[in-house]
């Protein structure tokens, strides 16, 4: 690694710490030429597939958008933040494991539905009513009957 002080290319790692989430590493380094110390951070770079909307537009995947969808569906429901985070991690892992450059928004929606159904039935019905564009009480009845089975 190049020293930020003297641009020498040879540095030594003198300390390494893995952060709790195990997604990043902090390293203290010392330059072999000027002996100055500096810190570097390493983090894996993952690329999520682009999301293809119903109208054909392609947008960048958004973790925050997914989290907001979960929070909206689970508003005032007894589900911990940890369980929500775990559900989102499972969805993101599935998206990465697909190995695709693009994924239809409908596929993400179905993954969300599957996770919500496991977390909280009321949240599942809330999300489904918007996602599937319910038009009347019969749509709700059909879904509630399905959930009760």
From Swiss-Prot:
Q: Which family does it belong to?
A: Belongs to the NrdR family.
Is Protein biosynthesis there in the keyword field? no
The cross-references to Pfam families, in alphabetical order and at most eight, read: ATP-cone (PF03477), Zn_ribbon_NrdR (PF22811)
Q: Does the keyword Glycoprotein apply?
A: no
Zinc finger regions typed unnamed: which residues? Answer: 3-34
Q: What is the lineage of its organism?
A: Bacteria, Pseudomonadati, Pseudomonadota, Betaproteobacteria, Burkholderiales
Tell me where on the tree of life, at the top rank, the source sits. Answer: Bacteria
Q: What does this protein do?
A: Negatively regulates transcription of bacterial ribonucleotide reductase nrd genes and operons by binding to NrdR-boxes.
Name the PANTHER family on file: TRANSCRIPTIONAL REPRESSOR NRDR
Stored HAMAP family = NrdR (MF_00440)
Ordered alphabetically, the record's keywords are: ATP-binding, DNA-binding, Metal-binding, Nucleotide-binding, Repressor, Transcription, Transcription regulation, Zinc, Zinc-finger
Annotated signal peptide: none
Coiled-coil residues are none
Any one GO molecular-function label of the UniProt entry: zinc ion binding
Q: How many cofactors are bound and how? A: Binds 1 zinc ion.
Q: Which cofactor does it need?
A: Zn(2+)
Q: What is the name of this protein?
A: Transcriptional repressor NrdR
Q: Where is the ATP-cone domain?
A: 49-139
